């Protein structure tokens, strides 16, 4: 890589890595400031209300919607990863076109291969998280179906824990989709990588934080 590419890659990692480290810290320490933290609190209320109902159709329908969404995104992620694997076979053919528009970055075809490998790994990670999300949603369906209205606090906390873990893996899977934007742009040069990282970070900040707690 060229010196300027090292610089832009480092800045991109600082933007994305620093933002996510801060975001997950806030989710744990001050959950009321983040949408994820507030959603976790609502999930606890949701579990209590679903257990209190004799008719669990609403719970079943809600879980069905969540599992269908995770299934679709997992399938899409693995299909994209498989398609990108096909590009690796013909990387020499596509490298000529890509390197023509990569003005500031390295002209090494091996680096292009590395970028594609990172993109593939990113989608495999997204697929893995969505499948884990499905696993825990299935646990929740079983837990709520087996729980009665006299369920203890320990049982309720276990159900909430499974639901939160399912939601967390879904969130991490979605991060894989978001992070593919700067990685994909990096193929066309480090300047595009930096621009994509900054725009992705700003967009995530505005969607991850409660409106009253945003500073930008």
Q: Where do the protein language model's features map onto the residues?
A:
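Hydrophobic alpha-helical membrane-embedded segments
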Residues: 5-34, 71-85, 116-137, 178
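Hydrophobic alpha-helical transmembrane segments and adjacent short intramembrane/lumenal linkers
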Residues: 149-175, 185-186
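Membrane-interface amphipathic/juxtamembrane segments adjacent to transmembrane helices
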Residues: 24-63
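Juxtamembrane non-transmembrane "cap" segments at the membrane-aqueous interface
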Residues: 89-98, 138-162
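Juxtamembrane "helix exit" motif at the C-terminal ends of alpha-helical transmembrane segments
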Residues: 80-104, 186-194, 200-205
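Alpha-helical transmembrane segments and their membrane-interface exit regions
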Residues: 15, 199-211
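Transmembrane alpha-helical segments and their cytosolic interface motifs
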Residues: 61-85, 168-194
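A cytosolic-side transmembrane-helix exit/cap motif
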Residues: 212-216
């Amino acid at each position: 890589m060229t010196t300027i590419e090292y610089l832009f890659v480092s800045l991109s990692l600082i933007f994305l890595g620093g933002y996510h480290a801060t975001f997950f810290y806030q989710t744990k320490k001050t959950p009321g400031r983040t949408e994820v933290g507030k959603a976790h609190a609502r999930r606890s209320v949701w579990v209590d209300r679903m257990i209190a109902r004799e008719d669990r159709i609403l719970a079943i329908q809600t879980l069905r919607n969540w599992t269908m969404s995770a299934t679709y995104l997992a399938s899409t992620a693995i299909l994209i990863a498989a398609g990108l694997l096909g590009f690796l076979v013909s990387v020499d053919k596509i490298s000529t076109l890509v390197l023509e528009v990569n003005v500031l970055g390295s002209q090494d075809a091996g680096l292009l291969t590395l970028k594609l490998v990172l993109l593939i790994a990113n989608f495999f990670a997204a697929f893995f998280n969505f499948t884990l999300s499905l696993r825990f949603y299935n646990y929740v369906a079983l837990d709520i179906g087996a729980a009665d209205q006299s369920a203890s606090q320990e049982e309720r906390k276990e159900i909430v824990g499974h639901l939160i873990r399912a939601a967390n893996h879904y969130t991490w899977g979605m991060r894989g989709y978001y992070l593919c934007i700067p990685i994909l742009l990096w193929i066309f040069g480090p300047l595009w990588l930096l621009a994509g990282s900054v725009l992705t970070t700003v967009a995530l900040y505005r969607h991850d934080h409660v409106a009253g707690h945003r500073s930008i």
